[in-house]
């Protein structure tokens, strides 16, 4: 609740005569303070560069791991690394060893990430978002060094050392923690009604990793014809990001503490919570448990849906490539064009459609005068309807792929499912409005924990289903994904919201019919 002092200050004129020779009120000082104010425009370019770099390493990482396994395990007498890689291309034993290695790396990184991510985000409420973003880059940087050492000295550095890179990646939180820390940064500096649009830009940057990353990697490999140059470039970018996060990015939490008094609230928290140990992962989940039953149900549905969506997105891309290669014999060029086209469409929806739609809803709300005197709710105007509409689009997209067994069906179904890209930022925005401002880091840390768990379970389950059915019904996986999305769509109908504003009036069956508050 706003204090009387704040109310008086807000009624003062914006422009007043300077009372003294205060530098902060001079033209230069005021401009510099405004320039260094925390803003999404500071964060988004850095996060986008981070995400695209991670995406551009997908192909080089695959080839480097495959080449090292082939050279060290199956062609130890062959001194030519590239020639050994070409000879092992169709070796089923090499493919089996590669698959087993990826399982070890994924489980190791996922478990360590599940431990480190929530605690790092919990610490961010005390030490700020910048240090966490900085830590999230250290793991990939160390992994780059290990891979470079293995590529330069393939006979001396065993491929098992790459697992140390996976471990460092997990301990630093990597892209998962960088994403949640970026979302916390946005939450610190934005009003609740503006978060969907801001989170959409974060999601668009994350999607750009899959859209632009493989294209960049393919271009680098075609120009340099070597994996080493690609990793040296990634090393340079990660090193530059450390400098940018340290020196250029303004801290968001300090500004929030000064303006909203969160620093005082933090000191009043129970001492036991403030002294929670690093490995007490479950303590972070307390940010997900509201007191009343209705809010608790809402948060469970939203959090589980968001975590499942993340797990599916992490495991779906390689299976889409495998399905298209098996069914339609698509090769690298066709697969790259397919992934780029689908992800660019998702980016367009995120950066153009969602902000325009949400701004239109807010303008209509202000024009009708409905925002005055209304309590803040977890689901703003249009948000609950957006969640249900996106889930419906994903159901339709996956079912289209499962039913229409043709290249056109895969493309159309993927574009339809890609139209549901606003689902993740909308869910995250709603989650941040369910807890106090001083608990944002703890909340997003718990979300990071769920992400790490779903990153292990769902891709493993999807690979098992596809491997078990590819010989008879290769489209069964997409039918299962459509069924799962349908379950979450039904669950979203049980979400309650004490709001007088309807969601997306054009779709009355998707509207929120809860009673007026």
Swiss-Prot record:
InterPro entries: MFS, MFS_trans_sf, Sugar_transporter_CS. Glycans are attached at residues 63, 265, 497, 512. It is a multi-pass membrane protein. Keywords: Glycoprotein, Membrane, Transmembrane, Transmembrane helix, Transport. The chain crosses the membrane at residues 40-60, 103-123, 131-151, 161-181, 204-224, 230-250, 299-319, 338-358, 391-411, 442-462, 476-496. PROSITE patterns: SUGAR_TRANSPORT_1. Residues 1-12 have a biased composition (Basic and acidic residues). Residues 1-28 are annotated as: Disordered. GO terms for cellular component: membrane. It is found in: Membrane. MFS-type transporter; part of the cluster that mediates the biosynthesis of a highly modified cyclo-arginine-tryptophan dipeptide (cRW). Belongs to the major facilitator superfamily. TCR/Tet family. This is MFS-type transporter avaJ. The lineage of its organism: Eukaryota, Fungi, Dikarya, Ascomycota, Pezizomycotina. The gene is avaJ.
